[in-house]
Amino acid sequence: MAKCAICEKGPHFGNAVSHSHRRSNKVWNANVKSVKVKVNGNAKKMYVCTSCLRSGLVERA
């Protein structure tokens, strides 16, 4: 999965543990959206996580 272009938040890895306590690999992906963003007055498509979008770190084009 993609990384956030602003905060570089990416996937986290760990184990999924079943009821019988067997472990298998699990990935938690960041909530990343493809967004058109203003960069130096031009519109550019970037992957941005929703926490950066909500906090106003980027300006949509």
UniProtKB/Swiss-Prot annotation:
Gene (name only): rpmB
Molecular function GO terms recorded: structural constituent of ribosome
Sequence similarity: Belongs to the bacterial ribosomal protein bL28 family.
Cellular compartments per GO CC: ribonucleoprotein complex; ribosome
Protein name per its UniProtKB record: Large ribosomal subunit protein bL28
Keywords, in A-Z order: Ribonucleoprotein, Ribosomal protein
Highest taxon of the lineage: Bacteria
One GO-annotated biological process of the protein: translation
The species this protein was found in: Lachnospira eligens (strain ATCC 27750 / DSM 3376 / VPI C15-48 / C15-B4) (Eubacterium eligens)
